[in-house]
Design a protein with these regions (language model features):
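N-terminal helical capping/dimerization or prosegment-like subdomains
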Residues: 2-88, 263-267, 281-284, 373-375
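Metal-dependent amide/peptide-bond hydrolase catalytic core
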Residues: 3, 14, 178-183, 190, ...
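A structural signal for short hydrophobic beta-strand segments in well-ordered beta-sheet cores
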Residues: 54, 67, 100-102, 247-250, ...
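Hydrophobic/aromatic beta-strand patches that form the interior of the parallel beta-sheet core
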Residues: 75-79, 143, 172-174, 353-357
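Active-site metal-coordination/substrate-binding segment of hydrolases
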Residues: 76-141
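Acidic-glycine-rich active-site phosphate/pyrophosphate-binding loop
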Residues: 88-102, 170, 174, 191-201, ...
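Fold-level recognition of mixed alpha/beta catalytic cores in primary-metabolism enzymes, strongest
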Residues: 107, 117-126, 130-228, 368-378
Length: 394
């Protein structure tokens, strides 16, 4: 083995050890939404050491970070991530959920996959980029929040607003969500469906079940409404982005069996194609349920608009991500818009291309959430390859 190859191997081992240590450190911050628990403070220290300008700000108890470093003139691209996690009690965990312990080459801990693993991998890739002696062009932003797993009102939405008010326009945004399925890099998100919830209050007239002619049965009306909702057609869908409507509750406050119910509440959630907007969805369903209008009141809740990124003819973030993944894995990823909503929606617009790319999502939010060290190293390699394609002048 030559001296150069030997030195490269030693450097690689050292960086891999740093990567593992970074993830363990992040896991040990008990940053349950919206508490950053010191995780963002630690990131500020790490990024400042790499030469980033860092701005930390709070909004309604949420901590956010905007950090950037400017090279020569070139593309303006961001990494968007979150350090908050869903709750975890010791319960059935193999190890305490905030220890970051390694068992048989696997790192266990809340947030290991969603998404502290992605943050640790991008931090290591960022350090490699900064330390590279190659000429670089562009501006690199880090956009981190402690409010992604909750209502997401005061996290990335506020970061996007602050960027806009400062006249900062991103060419691209890489979101480090765990998008992979069977193998790291097998799936990336080039969009997300929108989401919209609703409550329908159905009002009838109560009475004795033996005299139905004197009543208006709210349950019977509700059954017809549920049937109407379940049969709704969505003509604008395309193959890669399907709209689905799921009834999530039918509730009647009735404690006896001889009383026709006067009220019923129906709840439902729609995950809708990027071909629609929330206002279009509301209009379609209001028209569909118009025949029941004298009996119902609809309250719409928690709208999340969809986004969709297509390949561009000039500079294309999709192409950069696809090439980085192919270079590191030998395969091209599947493009998908499936799954839940993400913070990508806050940064996507007609100019900003948003792509989500990260670890496997098979254990997220579960007891014994984990990531293998091999997967962690692989996603870091993809990230560094991607950053090199974006920033290193060729």
């Amino acid at each position: 083995m030559s001296l150069v190859v030997s030195q490269q191997a030693v450097t690689s081992q050292r960086l891999n050890a740093e990567l593992i240590n970074k993830l363990q450190t992040l896991i040990q911050f008990k940053s349950v939404t919206p508490n950053q628990a010191g995780a963002i403070d630690w990131l500020v220290m790490q990024l400042c050491e790499l030469g980033f300008c860092c701005e930390k700000f709070t909004s309604s108890g949420v901590t956010n970070l905007i950090a950037h470093i400017k090279f020569n003139e070139g593309p303006c691209v961001a990494f968007s991530g979150h350090i908050d996690v869903v709750p975890a009690d010791n319960g059935d965990w193999l190890t305490p959920p905030f220890d970051g312990r390694i068992i048989n080459g696997v790192i266990y801990g809340r947030g290991a996959a969603d998404m502290k693993g992605g943050v640790a991998a991008m931090l290591t890739a960022t350090k490699k980029l900064i330390n590279s002696t190659s000429s670089k062009a562009g501006t690199f932003y880090w956009l981190i929040t402690s409010d992604e797993e909750g209502e997401a009102e005061f996290g990335s939405a506020q970061i996007a607003n602050k960027l806009s008010s400062n006249g900062i326009v991103l060419d691209g945004c890489i979101v480090g969500e765990p998008t992979s399925s069977t193998h790291v890099g097998d799936t990336i998100k080039n969009g997300r469906r929108g989401a919209l919830s609703a409550r329908i209050l159905v009002k009838g007239r109560a009475g004795h079940v033996a005299y139905p002619q004197n009543t208006i049965n709210a349950a019977h009306i509700s059954a017809k409404i549920v049937n109407k909702l379940s049969e709704q057609a969505w003509h604008l869908d395309d193959a890669g982005s399907k709209t689905t409507l799921q009834v999530t509750g039918i509730n009647i406050d009735n404690v006896v069996d001889n009383l026709v119910p006067s009220h019923c509440e129906i709840t439902f959630n729609i995950r809708y194609s990027h071909r629609y907007s929330s206002e279009k969805i509301k209009s379609i369903l209001n028209n569909s349920l118009d025949e029941f209008s004298r009996y119902i009141t609809i309250n719409w809740e928690r709208p999340c608009e969809p986004y969709y990124t297509q390949p561009k003819s000039k500079w294309s973030l999709i192409t950069c991500v696809e090439q980085a993944i192919h270079s590191q894995t030998g395969n091209y990823p599947v493009l998908s818009t499936s799954g839940g909503t993400s913070d990508g929606r806050f940064f996507a617009n007609s100019h900003t291309q948003v792509i989500e790319c990260g670890l496997r999502n098979n254990t997220i939010h579960q007891v014994n959430e984990h990531v293998s060290i091999d997967d962690l190293i692989k996603v870091e390699a993809i990230y560094y390859d991607l950053l090199s394609r974006i920033y290193i002048e060729r």
